[in-house]
Amino acid sequence: MGPLRQFVQNFRLLSGFGTDHRVFLDVVKACASVSDLTSGRALHGCVFKLGHIACSEVSKSVLNMYAKCRRMDDCQKMFRQMDSLDPVVWNIVLTGLSVSCGRETMRFFKAMHFADEPKPSSVTFAIVLPLCVRLGDSYNGKSMHSYIIKAGLEKDTLVGNALVSMYAKFGFIFPDAYTAFDGIADKDVVSWNAIIAGFSENNMMADAFRSFCLMLKEPTEPNYATIANVLPVCASMDKNIACRSGRQIHSYVVQRSWLQTHVFVCNSLVSFYLRVGRIEEAASLFTRMGSKDLVSWNVVIAGYASNCEWFKAFQLFHNLVHKGDVSPDSVTIISILPVCAQLTDLASGKEIHSYILRHSYLLEDTSVGNALISFYARFGDTSAAYWAFSLMSTKDIISWNAILDAFADSPKQFQFLNLLHHLLNEAITLDSVTILSLLKFCINVQGIGKVKEVHGYSVKAGLLHDEEEPKLGNALLDAYAKCGNVEYAHKIFLGLSERRTLVSYNSLLSGYVNSGSHDDAQMLFTEMSTTDLTTWSLMVRIYAESCCPNEAIGVFREIQARGMRPNTVTIMNLLPVCAQLASLHLVRQCHGYIIRGGLGDIRLKGTLLDVYAKCGSLKHAYSVFQSDARRDLVMFTAMVAGYAVHGRGKEALMIYSHMTESNIKPDHVFITTMLTACCHAGLIQDGLQIYDSIRTVHGMKPTMEQYACAVDLIARGGRLDDAYSFVTQMPVEPNANIWGTLLRACTTYNRMDLGHSVANHLLQAESDDTGNHVLISNMYAADAKWEGVMELRNLMKKKEMKKPAGCSWLEVDGQRNVFVSGDCSHPRRDSIFDLVNALYLQMKEPVVF
């Protein structure tokens, strides 16, 4: 800019000696090309003083300079002062207005239309028709088409091209765009490009490719834009056809050196190969490219990312930065940040953030800020996400959606509501993505009332009815189901009618399962014509929770028979079945599948550990525990629970010590499990120390289960009076579990005097529980109070209380044998009873030492 202004200043000094108007023409054009308004104004004054303004070419050049510098007030003022208004003059003003003054351009065009002379030319329509697209004004576009026909310009190449492009952008392909294309007398490469792009943009890929094939039969040769238009069309086809067609086009390009060396064409070819998954061919072509621009690098980085080649994408970005020929732009950053998230590389993401902060042009780009928010949200770093959000100078609805989504499932509920309040004050219209974040928040806080509010807003805003794919409807259904309102979820399901998808069915099915409505779930399953792994995994869970282990295993086998690969959720639903059957053989099969399938989810490891312990194999449980360095609180709790069930209190204390060294803070569930382990192992002092630490170390209030464990520990030392005092002095009302614990201790230590008092408290706390009555009956029996036993038995009979029958499992050679108390249905019952009787007689025989 500086040298040009110096030149203009020197030119003005020399102009007094007389200068040809053609020199003025060249200098004014130079000012227009770089939008140098200051120099242009100076030249305008000079031209005016010397009388060169009377020259038509010079005046048009000055007019064009004002239009290019977007000084439309000066441009129109000069226009009104001009004596000769030919089509070129009108078109200059129309071009300037079309950049930023859409409606004003249309008014100016109408003024030209009603003027006696001149009439709009083909260039005029080439300027105004694209403006109709930008304004979304198809009515005026069609009106102009009528005017074009009356003016006899419909066969003109420039006008025809503009009409084809306009109709294609409005989606009016048949008959409008195609008729306009067919009417062009001399079709040039732009004509063919317009119709191919029009078909492609309207997802009419077969027609687009057919048009390209017809073009090849014409004298007009495809150019770089044609190749760029047709390659995405090929990529959208069936993979085998796509590869064959794309390679044929590549061969066509190689035979024409002017296309082969064009960087735009090379970028399009690389993009095509990446879209069809031919990564090696894309990489080879990229390496051979003579010249690469930033688009070349961006195409390959984004292509690697879309093909899940995260490391290759990151390595290429690293090469781009260190090569230094071109600098990353916003497109590069938007592509690479999700790659860092996939690689769980927070450090590299932060380095990229630092790079952004050092380059203000990136910091000002809203899309870059949006990508940063999403990146930090993937790591659960809401503070960093909010910081990136607060630094953004301009925020759009995508920015707000990204930050709301970051906070939606975090514990920071107040911040989410505060952000939502600010969004509503910004007067930005919420879209369906915003609603999805709101529903995620509602699920997080289990707020059924809030789900109804969001539902009401969605209906009023018309967001539900505008959906072709019921993404929002499915999300509402899922939110109602997860918040426990299956009735409303079913209403949403019915409302979706023919728009129901597999997601709709699975969401309702999951709602039924979570609410325990297994019959409704099974009925819905029978109605489903399409199923996926999620569906079948839910069916495994239904049978597992319904105590139908054989059916659950049958469903699991059906999953494999259908060629589906069970995932983490499937196995987690199946493992409780192994515990129900107490089948170590089945657990080991599941463990083998987990290893072969590479299922390393920490929650799955915790469940596997727990089931091994429940099946009696502490060795396998501890092996699973030791195998994962990511041990979390759930795994520690499961390991302690396993030791607790088997009375291995010392080992449980060792795990507790290990957890403390790992700086993992225990929760109520873990402490209760530790207390249970101490109770079962008789570790009274250790247990009481852990109980005291609930308040003194961890700053928590004991739960009812923990109070019951403390009572058990005190009573196990024979200090029943102390235990009774502890219960009566509790800051909360003791429940039946606590009184029942104390009653069992009274029975064990033969303290019937205290036991009668405790029994009365127990019945007052829970009078209709079968187990409580059996417990009291056992106490009477231990004290030989048979009248009390009979009285309680009669009372239980009157209340129709039944003690559940005892049940045992025994696995022999992978075959499960079930024995229920009083059951004689086993096929080998005779030999079993004979052996039991023989063992009983041996036990009765006197032992001789």
UniProtKB/Swiss-Prot annotation:
UniProt keywords, alphabetically: Repeat
Gene Ontology biological-process entries: mitochondrial mRNA modification; response to abscisic acid; response to water deprivation
Listed InterPro entries: E_motif (IPR046848), Pentatricopeptide_rpt (IPR002885), PPR_At4g14850-like_plant (IPR046960), TPR-like_helical_dom_sf (IPR011990)
Any one GO cellular component localisation term in the record: mitochondrion
Pfam families noted in UniProt: E_motif, PPR, PPR_2
Keyword Cell membrane in record: no
GO molecular function, one term: RNA binding
TM region(s), chain numbering: none
Type E(+) motif: annotated span: 814-844
Region (Type E motif) location: 738-813
Source organism, top-level taxon: Eukaryota
PPR repeats: 20-54, 55-89, 121-155, 156-187, 188-222, 223-260, 262-296, 297-327, 329-363, 365-399, 400-430, 431-465, 469-499, 501-531, 532-566, 567-597, 601-631, 632-666, 667-702, 703-733
PANTHER family the record matches: PENTATRICOPEPTIDE REPEAT-CONTAINING PROTEIN (PTHR47926:SF347)
Family: Belongs to the PPR family. PCMP-E subfamily.
Name used for this protein in its record: Putative pentatricopeptide repeat-containing protein At5g08490
Gene: PCMP-E32
